[in-house]
C-alpha cells in the first residue's frame, strides 16, 4: 500500500494469483480490508461454484472470473479445445451476475482462442497484452488478429497493459512500445494499466514505480493516461 499511496492510487483491482489456485481466501481478505468502494477483484472458481458463493463474492467487490493457463506454458496440442468447455460455462455464469472473464494465457494460446473470444457475450480482458511476445514484432499475426478484434469486434475485448517484463526481455522493454502504440491506436478506450504487483518471481528485477513511469513514456499525453488509468477501469469494473 505504501507504493500505491506514493503513486496516488485510491482504488484497486486485485486478481487471484496463480500460486493460490482456486483458494480465494487471501483475495477475500484483501477485499474486506479495502472495502467495496475502493476495491474490485477477479477470482478463480470451479465450474460448479454455487450461486450463493458468487453472490457473496459479488457483494465484496468481485467482478470477474480468471481463465488461467501459465503464460510460459509451451505449445500443447488440444489444450485450446479442452478450455472451450470452461470458457462456455464461465461465460454463462458471468452473464447471469454481470461479471467478466479475465484471461491469463501464453501468446500462442491467446491466438488460438481469439475466434472463440470474438463470440463472447460478456466483457473480457487479456492480461499482459495477451502475452504476444515483443520479439515477434508489431506486425506478428496474433497481434494483427487481436487488432482486428478490437477494431471490428463487438466491443467486449479489453487489454491489460501489465507485466511487460514477461513479454519483453529487451532492456527498457523498448521492443514492446510499438505493440502498445498499435493497441492505443486501435482501442484507447479499452486499455487499462496494472502494476501486477508483487511481480512474483520477477520481484528482484522490476518494481511498480518503474512500470508506472514506463506508462508515461508510452502515453506522454495526459488525456491518454487518464483514459487508461481512470476512465476505462471505472467503466470496466463498475466503480
Identify what each model region corresponds to:
Residues 80-193:
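Catalytic pocket-lining loop regions of alpha/beta-barrel enzymes
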Residues 1-11, 188-190, 203-239:
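Mid-to-C-terminal alpha-helical segments outside catalytic/metal-binding sites
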Residues 47, 131, 199:
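Short, glycine/acidic-enriched loop or turn micro-motifs at the edges of active sites
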Residues 1-18, 22, 58:
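An N-terminally biased module of ancient metal coordination in phosphate/nucleic-acid-related enzymes
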Residues 25-42, 117, 121-126, 176-187, ...:
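Short, electropositive alpha-helical surface patch
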Amino acid at each position: 500500500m505504501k507504493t500505491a499511496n506514493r503513486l496516488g492510487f485510491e482504488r484497486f483491482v486485485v486478481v487471484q494469483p496463480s500460486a493460490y489456485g482456486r483458494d480465494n481466501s487471501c483475495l477475500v481478505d484483501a477485499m474486506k480490508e479495502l472495502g467495496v468502494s475502493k476495491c474490485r477483484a477477479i477470482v478463480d472458481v470451479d465450474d460448479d461454484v454455487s450461486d450463493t458463493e458468487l453472490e457473496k463474492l459479488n457483494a465484496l467487490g468481485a467482478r470477474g472470473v480468471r481463465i488461467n493457463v501459465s503464460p510460459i506454458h509451451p505449445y500443447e496440442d488440444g489444450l485450446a479445445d479442452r478450455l472451450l468447455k470452461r470458457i462456455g460455462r464461465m461465460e454463462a455464469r458471468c452473464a447471469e451476475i454481470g461479471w467478466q472473464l479475465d484471461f491469463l494465457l501464453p501468446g500462442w494460446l491467446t491466438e488460438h482462442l481469439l475466434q472463440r473470444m470474438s463470440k463472447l457475450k460478456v466483457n473480457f480482458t487479456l492480461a499482459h497484452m495477451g502475452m504476444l511476445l515483443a520479439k515477434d514484432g508489431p506486425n506478428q499475426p496474433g497481434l494483427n488478429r487481436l487488432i482486428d478484434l478490437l477494431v471490428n469486434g463487438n466491443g467486449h475485448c479489453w487489454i491489460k497493459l501489465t507485466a511487460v517484463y514477461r513479454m519483453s526481455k529487451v532492456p527498457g522493454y523498448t521492443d514492446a512500445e510499438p505493440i502498445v502504440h498499435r493497441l492505443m491506436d486501435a482501442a484507447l478506450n479499452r486499455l487499462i494499466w496494472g502494476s501486477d504487483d508483487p511481480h512474483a518471481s520477477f520481484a528482484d528485477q522490476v518494481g511498480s514505480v518503474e512500470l508506472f513511469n514506463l506508462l508515461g513514456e508510452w502515453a506522454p499525453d495526459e488525456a491518454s493516461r487518464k483514459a487508461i488509468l481512470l476512465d476505462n477501469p471505472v467503466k470496466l469494473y463498475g466503480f
